[in-house]
UniProtKB/Swiss-Prot annotation:
It comes from Saccharomyces cerevisiae (strain ATCC 204508 / S288c) (Baker's yeast). HAMAP family: Transaldolase_1. InterPro entries: Aldolase_TIM, TAL/FSA, Transaldolase_1, Transaldolase_AS. The modification N-acetylserine is found at S2. The gene is TAL1. Two isoenzymes seem to be encoded by the same gene. Present with 53000 molecules/cell in log phase SD medium. Its EC number is 2.2.1.2. Homodimer. The keyword Oxidoreductase does not apply. This is Transaldolase. The keyword Transferase applies.
Length: 335
């Protein structure tokens, strides 16, 4: 075999290609769109923290200039101008990402609206309108919303009435996942690594492979969705290692950071399919319901200390980063 042929065979057999071959759709988790083309992901996800990190890079100064210019023209007060500029910045990043990925981009609603159903709906509609004004169809955008009671209800209405596709994020519990499926949202992002972080911190133990609590959580959700025929896509998110990814091969989607995508691309470790719809149907438990019972949803979520703490922490972190992003844009709007 010639050297180029050997090299080609090696690339074809890398762990990333095997993961894709397992049936899992690979998504790039970053705002740094310059780093994703080589991985050939189907979709890309962003969040306030990732956009903030990317916005600080000189490479993306042009996008900020466009957003600031837009903000200045669309707002009477500085506050309005800054908010409009930030919304436009999210759309600018989304537009650039969609030049690279063939599928969809996830763009997040301001995390400070996580407990306000109506404000979340209005912000989602506004973001979609901005995308459409830039020639991007709503079919190519997923609106990311925190999986609070209010967020899930907002997503339900957006999906039903507006045909706006939603990605329910900061999902740490089976309770949240069940309610999202009943709301018929397009996609959920159950977090894996952050669940592992909590258990390691609270027990002092290490968890590997199938014993990883984050992996167990996603498997349970996947099995339940497949058993009861829910069409909501399960997209595992927030990974600490390629080991977590390996143990979820076969799940609908996985959104992975460029650093871990790079590791997968440069590894030839076998990635056999672990999850599949047929065995999932045998493993899931009884059907339950939350979508019309707010008190039951809140109580059962509250019973899960990990999910309650991680949801609160996640909203605080994303809110802090959106405030920092607003401050960064305000300096430019008022300069």
């Amino acid at each position: 075999m010639s050297e180029p042929a050997q090299k080609k065979q090696k690339v074809a057999n890398n762990s990333l290609e095997q993961l894709k071959a397992s049936g899992t759709v690979v998504v790039a988790d970053t705002g740094d769109f310059g780093s994703i083309a080589k991985f050939q992901p189907q979709d890309s996800t962003t969040n306030p923290s990732l956009i903030l990190a990317a916005a600080k890079q000189p490479t993306y100064a042009k996008l900020i200039d466009v957003a600031v210019e837009y903000g200045k023209k669309h707002g009477k007060t500085t506050e309005e101008q800054v908010e409009n500029a930030v919304d436009r910045l999210l759309v600018e990043f989304g537009k650039e990402i969609l030049k690279i990925v063939p599928g969809r981009v996830s763009t997040e609603v301001d995390a400070r609206l996580s407990f306000d159903t109506q404000a979340t709906i209005e912000k989602a509609r506004h973001i979609i309108k901005l995308f459409e004004q830039e020639g991007v169809s709503k079919e190519r955008v997923l609106i990311k919303i925190a999986s609070t009671w209010e967020g899930i209800q907002a997503a339900k209405e957006l999906e039903e009435k507006d045909g706006i596709h939603c990605n329910l994020t900061l999902l740490f519990s089976f309770v949240q996942a069940v309610a999202c499926a009943e709301a018929q949202v397009t996609l959920i992002s159950p977090f894996v690594g952050r669940i592992l972080d909590w258990y390691k911190s609270s027990t002092g133990k290490d968890y590997k492979g199938e014993a990883d609590p984050g992996v167990i959580s996603v498997k349970k959700i996947y099995n339940y969705y497949k058993k009861y025929g829910y069409k909501t896509i399960v997209m595992g998110a927030s990974f600490r290692s390629t080991d977590e990814i390996k143990n979820l091969a076969g799940v609908d989607y996985l959104t992975i950071s460029p650093a871990l995508l790079d590791k997968l691309m440069n590894s030839t470790e076998p990635f056999p399919r672990v999850l599949d719809p047929v065995s999932a149907k045998k493993e899931a438990g009884d059907k339950i319901s939350y979508i019309s019972d707010e008190s039951k949803f809140r109580f059962d979520l509250n019973e899960d200390a990990m999910a309650t703490e991680k949801l609160s922490e996640g909203i605080r972190k994303f809110s802090a980063d959106i405030v920092t992003l607003f401050d960064l844009i305000e300096k430019k709007v008022t300069a």
